[in-house]
């Protein structure tokens, strides 16, 4: 009536992007009995957590991703789709051939000064922090006021200058709000109870999440908006 055309759409939902958010929404919608179409402008699924096999190694194409959470329900949910290894992120900084544990913890301080108790480490840091009096005028002074000169010179300065492309004395103090210091022998980067990387890579995990769901790759939603909006 009234000249209106009723068009039955092919899908209940159109999901743009096949990263974790889009893939999990699509999975849950399908589980609830809805029909879903997923489109992604990239030639692969999994968004920024995409991994691909090179020489038998799962390479993280868009930077390293380590899954970590304290939420048991989240962990139980995600492990339906992949078995996770027990990878624990324990970074090490190389300063002129000396290896230092990151984030700053008792292993770092022991290597730096030979201290063995939290009290000794705290006293050393406090003593060095006193070098800066008054309001820090630049990033160098800010870092020294937080962790002292030794840690700044060996573990903050070079990395920060490489990151910003300029001298720490030329960078504003507000860039570094705080530098976490742990007075424990703990070099676990995350404090999360559950952490790891899916065996077989993230792409395989997202494939499992999207099982039975139609996915169109190399499809930019903005370029095909009208056609895709007519479908869902």
Spans of model-derived segments:
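N-terminal Rossmann-like FAD-binding beta1-loop-alpha1 element of flavoenzymes
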Residues: 11-38
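Active-site/ligand-binding neighborhood in enzyme catalytic cores
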Residues: 93-100, 106-231
């Amino acid at each position: 009536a009234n000249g209106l055309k009723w068009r039955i759409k092919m899908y209940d939902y159109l999901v743009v992007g096949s990263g974790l958010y889009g893939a999990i929404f699509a999975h849950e919608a399908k589980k609830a009995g809805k029909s879903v179409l997923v489109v992604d402008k990239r030639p692969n699924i999994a968004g920024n957590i995409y991994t691909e096999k090179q020489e038998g190694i799962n390479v993280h194409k868009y930077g390293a991703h380590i899954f970590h959470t304290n939420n048991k329900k989240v962990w139980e949910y995600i492990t339906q789709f992949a078995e996770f290894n027990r990878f624990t992120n324990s970074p090490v900084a190389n300063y002129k051939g000396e290896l230092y544990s990151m984030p700053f913890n008792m292993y770092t301080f022991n290597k730096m000064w030979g201290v063995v108790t939290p009290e000794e480490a705290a006293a050393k840091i406090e003593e060095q922090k006193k070098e800066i009096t008054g309001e820090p005028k630049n990033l160098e002074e800010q870092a020294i006021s937080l962790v002292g000169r030794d840690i700044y010179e060996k573990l903050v300065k070079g990395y920060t200058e490489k990151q910003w492309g300029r001298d720490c004395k030329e960078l504003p103090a507000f860039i570094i709000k705080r530098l976490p210091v742990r007075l424990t022998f703990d070099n676990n980067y995350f404090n999360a109870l559950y952490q790891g990387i899916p065996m077989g890579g993230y792409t395989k995990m997202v494939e499992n999440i999207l099982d039975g769901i139609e996915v169109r790759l190399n499809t930019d939603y903005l370029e095909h908006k009208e056609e895709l909006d007519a479908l869902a």
